Swiss-Prot record:
Pathway: Glycan biosynthesis; glycogen biosynthesis. It comes from the Bacteria. GO terms for biological process: glycogen biosynthetic process. This is Glycogen synthase. It catalyses: [(1->4)-alpha-D-glucosyl](n) + ADP-alpha-D-glucose = [(1->4)-alpha-D-glucosyl](n+1) + ADP + H(+). Belongs to the glycosyltransferase 1 family. Bacterial/plant glycogen synthase subfamily.
Amino acid sequence: MKVLFVTSEAYPLVKTGGLGDVAGALPAALRDIGVDARILLPAYPDAMRRARLTGKTVPLGNPLGVGETRLLEGTMPDTGCPLWLLDCPAMYERTGGPYMMYSGVDWPDNFRRFALLSKVAAMIGTAGDLMDWRPDVLHGHDWQTGLVPAYLNAWGARRPPFLFSIHNMEYRGLFGPEILDLIGLPRSQFSINGLEFHGLVSTLKAGIVYAQAVATVSPSYAAEIKTPVGGQGLEGLLQARAGDLSGILNGIDSNAWNPQTDPYLAAPIDGADPAPGKRINKDMLKRRMGLDADGDRPLFGLVSRFVAQKGIDLVVAALPGMIAGGAQVAILGAGDTGLEAALNDIVGRYPGAAAVHVGYDEHLAHLIEGAADFLLVPSRFEPCGLTQLYALRYGTIPVVRRTGGLADSVSHLDDGPNGTGIVFDHALPDALEWAIGRAMTLYRDKATLNKVRQRGMSQDFSWKRSAKEYLRVYGSMVGGDVHRP
């Protein structure tokens, strides 16, 4: 089985969020179970610096009329997974992020940049002599690759089949209809049964419409996006594609996130008895973040973007009561300046009980995951989520809202003998405060606390598990008829 991953980011070459983690780790996990998985990624400056290039190039001419284009062969620096960088200096050789300028404004030619990625992926899939390698399946990710099957549809190509993975429905890839002429797609696709969405082109919709199969990053999120709450206006289409829609929970990199060998921890954490290692790491985190070291107090961690989706406003509302009840809080993240200011205000009012580090620090992220007694993940919606998976692996008990991947990965400790965390239902301050109170009650029962930690650490959230599920989807696509709208 040969699979080409088409993606706009892949860790450690370039990453802005969870998509980068998936696209970096899943191909390697698939290769471990016998799949010939390879990655196609734009040749951003960071990717060019970090990839291990072989020196082999394949000229592609000027397939989109935006400049000379070529493929650069290489491998991923950490896993050795085969890689092709799509080199078009006019599109990708620029300072800033993969999607935005340093100012935070989207690149105005994003439609061209990712149409080129999509068109070249379709070319690789249909031109057997292009790379001396032809994929059995094309696997694209999010709106940036939604035009891959649109090109295949326009060319009348029935193979290879395309799997479209949705990591976040909020990003729909919306552009004016005039782009179709500029990127070489027929106007006939601009219809309610094609890629038209309220008078605009939606590349996310294109992926859903023209792909043979659709996947998302957790079973619960697959159900949620078929409803008005989660579907972002595309729920009817997703209901129609329900038979082709899979929800596969993301995995984690069990080498990078290994509580026995993590170099960022002050001491290893043993799944058979997490308490001693947790205690040492907790002491280290308190010293690093300036939290009071005296007393046996529950420590809550939060590692998150500071945005409304993540429920940070709920945390702001709950913090004074938590601290009054004897808890301490260690927070890492960045985002909305108003939420940053609110968190910093609480730190100023409760020195020694609350600490915030604004920004991202990989060392501190690992230390919080390993040191905290509980991890707060009160998201309003969460397609999958990774921090709760890291927490479980490190013996930290997640406090999560019942949504998306949080619901699939954390079971409430009062719902049966195998509970691994504390789960609440509503995105309201009172609901989070109830969950925090339940956590503080658990903390006082040290024997039960350690058992819940042990259960969490015994869970399997490896990419190998996820890779086997994707392999089953690929197999069904290769053996079945290709969906056409």
